[in-house]
A protein has these predicted regions:
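Feature for intrinsically disordered/low-complexity regulatory segments and propeptides
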Residues: 1-67, 249
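Intrinsically disordered, low-complexity regions enriched in serine/threonine
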Residues: 1-22, 98-279
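Short secondary-structure junctions
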Residues: 16, 69-83
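A near-ubiquitous, low-amplitude feature marking generic local secondary-structure context
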Residues: 28, 45-49, 76, 155, ...
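Intrinsically disordered, low-complexity coil segments
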Residues: 36-44, 73, 100-112
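A broad "ordered helical/assembly scaffold" signature
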Residues: 49-50, 85, 172-176
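Beta-rich nucleic-acid/ligand-interaction surfaces
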Residues: 77-99
């Protein structure tokens, strides 16, 4: 399993405490604190301030929930990635028995297989509601492909102690069961990318018009990765460039939430480009 920021324990104890003014008056806000001490020494650190009605679910509860859901699913799920920066948490699974293969110009492209992924997102500072969603993973390089539009997600409104929690579980399982058409649509766009030769004019078009919100520094990393991986190839494709994007954004050794946001941005924009310009 790929871990990001391993020095932070995503499953440390957490608590929600009322805030008070300097004169002792109560505040309507609450502080979220995590125990950063070794072996539960009670060294509490504030990681966020939220409202009284904020549903605080610990990352341990999220892990238990994810484990319950993946056990209920008929697919064989494996934890592939874990992200935690002290405030935001992500747990990413892959089902290697639920795959599709890129359809190249000469038929099915051997060895380029994409698997269904399932992720759970949580935050301690209120920046992200507890959510479960689907993504894809290219198995040959373990690049994750996140999307805001291509695949569904479920906002989880209850914790395991709530009787309505099972409703959320059923919604997530239904999301998995009904994903085939959505995945097929994404694979169709990926196949068009794979059939499309990337020349300098198209690369400029992508940089300027398709993914203009990617910063110059990030685009530079993507271009270096693309140049390295396509060295010696007669005809690099749009698919090669897109995978350079996801490689940089998924495997950043100093990963931030912005990498996941940019991953979804690039994926959605490139799929839209493929559907409108390449077909």
């Amino acid at each position: 399993m790929e871990k990001v920021k391993p020095k932070l324990n995503p499953y440390a104890d957490i608590r929600k405490v009322s805030l008070q003014g300097t004169d002792g008056t109560s505040s309507s806000a609450f502080a979220i604190q995590t125990d950063t001490g070794k072996s539960g020494k009670g060294k509490w650190k504030e990681v966020g301030v939220v409202r009284d009605d904020y549903l605080l679910v610990s990352n341990q509860q999220v892990f238990d929930m994810a484990n319950h859901i993946t056990q209920q699913s008929p697919l064989n799920w494996e934890v592939k990635k874990e992200f935690f920066n002290g405030k935001s948490f992500g747990l990413y699974y892959t089902a290697k028995d639920q795959t599709k293969t890129i359809d190249s110009e000469n038929g099915v492209k051997l060895g380029d297989t994409v698997a269904l992924g399932l992720h759970f997102l949580n935050s301690y500072d209120g920046s992200k509601a507890l959510t479960a969603g689907l993504h894809l993973e290219r198995l040959i390089c373990t690049n994750g492909m996140v999307t805001n539009h291509g695949l569904g997600s479920v906002r989880i409104l209850h914790d395991k102690s709530n009787a309505k929690w099972e409703n959320d579980v059923e919604k997530i399982l239904g999301l998995i069961d009904s994903s085939d058409n959505q995945v097929s649509n994404m694979m169709s766009a990926f196949s068009e990318m794979d059939r499309s030769i990337l020349d300098e004019a198209m690369l400029r078009q992508i940089a300027t018009n398709v993914i203009p919100n990617i910063s110059d520094s990030t685009f530079g990393k993507i271009y270096r990765n693309f140049s390295k991986e396509s060295k010696g190839k007669d005809n690099a494709t749009v698919w090669d460039f897109y995978n350079a994007c996801t490689n940089v954004l998924w495997h950043n050794p100093t990963q931030t939430r912005a990498d996941f946001t940019n991953n979804a941005y690039v994926t959605d924009r490139m799929i839209d480009f493929a559907n409108k310009e390449l077909i």
